[in-house]
Amino acid sequence: MPDYYDIGTIVNTHGIRGEVRVLVTTDFPADRFKVGNTVYVATSPKTALTIQSVREHKGLTLLTFKDYTDINQVLPFKGKKLQVTETALQPLDEGSYYYKDIIGLTVIDEQGQTLGKVNEILSPGPNDVWVIPRSGKSDILLPFLKSVVQSIDLDQKVAHVIVPEGLIDDAD
């Protein structure tokens, strides 16, 4: 069974002709959401859909799918993730990573102390932020910047970082 990776969420329907509103979560929307591409709805079992049309509307991507021409056909997909298989992933430039590669990394600071494991990645602005939960303390929100992340070893599943002063509040 292939691995699937999230590329967006169907947040609602649009009109009555089977169009859906998608909140895109991929860095490659033009590649992922092309007419003719196959995407999968995270249902059980997965539902394969062929994209029939793509357009932008009020900050969201609107999609229609081949053979889905009525709102009642797509309504069950509301709130579900859209996914692609690993074979649809493209090679990245050096120093770029898929979220799937970062989530689960053990993060070690400049003193050699383990801060924890990345369990989520936020995209609040110009750079991503790694979320590293800590037992009984507030999460560490580590910015993904060259000045902070010194090295990533995907084979060892570890990232070495320099923690900016004041970033970790151990008082709580």
UniProtKB/Swiss-Prot annotation:
UniProt note: domains: The PRC barrel domain binds ribosomal protein uS19.
Molecular function via GO: ribosome binding
Pfam families for the chain: PRC_RimM, RimM
One GO process term, biological-process aspect: ribosomal small subunit biogenesis
Subcellular location: Cytoplasm
Family the UniProt entry places it in: Belongs to the RimM family.
NCBIfam families: 16S_RimM
GO CC, alphabetical: cytoplasm; ribosome
Residue ranges annotated for the PRC barrel domain, each copy included: 94-167
Gene expressing this chain: rimM
Protein name: Ribosome maturation factor RimM
Biological role stated in the UniProt entry: An accessory protein needed during the final step in the assembly of 30S ribosomal subunit, possibly for assembly of the head region. Essential for efficient processing of 16S rRNA. May be needed both before and after RbfA during the maturation of 16S rRNA. It has affinity for free ribosomal 30S subunits but not for 70S ribosomes.
Keywords, alphabetical: Chaperone, Cytoplasm, Ribosome biogenesis, rRNA processing
Subunit structure: Binds ribosomal protein uS19.
Keyword Cytoplasm set for record: yes
